[in-house]
Regions:
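Residue-level signal for well-ordered alpha-helical positions
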Residues: 11, 68-69
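Short, polar N-cap/turn motifs at the start of nucleic acid-interacting alpha helices
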Residues: 15-22, 125-145
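C-terminal secondary-structure termini that scaffold catalytic or DNA-interacting sites
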Residues: 20, 31-53, 60-62, 81, ...
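Catalytic-site neighborhood detector that most strongly recognizes the C-terminal catalytic loop/helix
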Residues: 29, 134-160
Length: 168
């Protein structure tokens, strides 16, 4: 989905529309530093920008997975079982342990967001749509920080340019 970890942790079942096949991002979970106690406190707040409020279409694969999780989930939140938003730090640690247990090379959770954006662009999705799905207020953020062309894409680009110019 390209969701931020705080958005994943704050996702409630009521934000998942199975009929319309859409996830609505309306909250985020996080931590804020308390200067007096010198500790962090968990937060459940509205997203950071106007563009962060958004609807994300659900793929067939994710729709199936969400329906299966909903059958066994006692929580009002999609992630976790406590009845309150999962702590992003704890979920990040869980994700790292899961990758290790499955013998999958380590990737930071935020790397999934980069991979999502890159795969969308590789699939010929237009930049503006990808930017909106990610919740960016500026398309330049999407292009500069999240889209990573691979060698095949660069080779195809050169081939297209050569064909256009009729260079053999």
């Amino acid at each position: 989905t390209g969701m931020r970890i705080g958005e994943v942790c704050a996702l409630r079942w009521e934000d998942v529309d199975f009929r319309q096949k859409v996830i609505t991002i309306s909250y985020t979970a996080g931590r804020i530093y308390n200067c007096e106690s010198r500790t962090t406190e968990r937060t459940f707040t509205s997203p950071k920008t106007r563009n962060s409020y958004r609807e994300i279409p659900i793929s067939r694969q994710l729709l199936f997975a969400l329906k299966e999780v909903k059958k066994i989930s006692p929580s009002r939140f999609v992630v976790g079982t406590s009845g309150r938003p999962e702590d992003p730090r704890s979920y990040r640690d869980f994700f790292a342990r899961l990758l290790k247990r499955l013998n999958i090379p380590h990737i930071v959770f935020h790397g999934l967001r980069h991979t999502f954006a890159t795969r969308c662009i590789e699939s010929q999705c237009d930049y503006k749509t990808v930017s909106v799905i990610l919740g960016h207020s500026n398309i330049a953020t999407t292009l500069n920080l999240y889209v990573h062309p691979n060698l095949n894409q660069k080779q195809r680009c050169i081939e297209r340019m050569s064909n256009f110019l009729k260079i053999k």
